[in-house]
């Protein structure tokens, strides 16, 4: 990872074989998520209630799904990478399904994502986990190799894991706590699989 704090986060979440890069973020030459460490939480700050929080989490999962789908297509000639990102697309779809069902059970209606996005000037386009616009991320990976694309995916998943852990601890609603705890556990699984594949490709 690019920093000791990120490495500490992953170790605290139960991941093994975590390393910190010499030089930290200043030595990193790849793409980075926008904003400060609390930036992910900021997406949810204007949300008036739990229903909006669930809807916004869905929007971030949708953005990640679109990104993984694009990367999978980019590496269609690499069976392992194509399969991995295809699996991540399915995983994000499952997250969306769970969040959508939760939203509908709470409100009795489908979420209006256009209305939700209008509350956030930074979400006037598809944004994925980590706060990165999907179009920007897909443009970045076009001329990158497998390892760089995997590293970006890992950075995204670290952001998502951090965000969902914070949400599960900061929300009082027990249903919300359960949802975000479950999501954080699944993001940890994503991280483990991506890290294992990156080790294999290096």
PLM feature spans:
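Non-heme di-metal
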Residues: 1-202
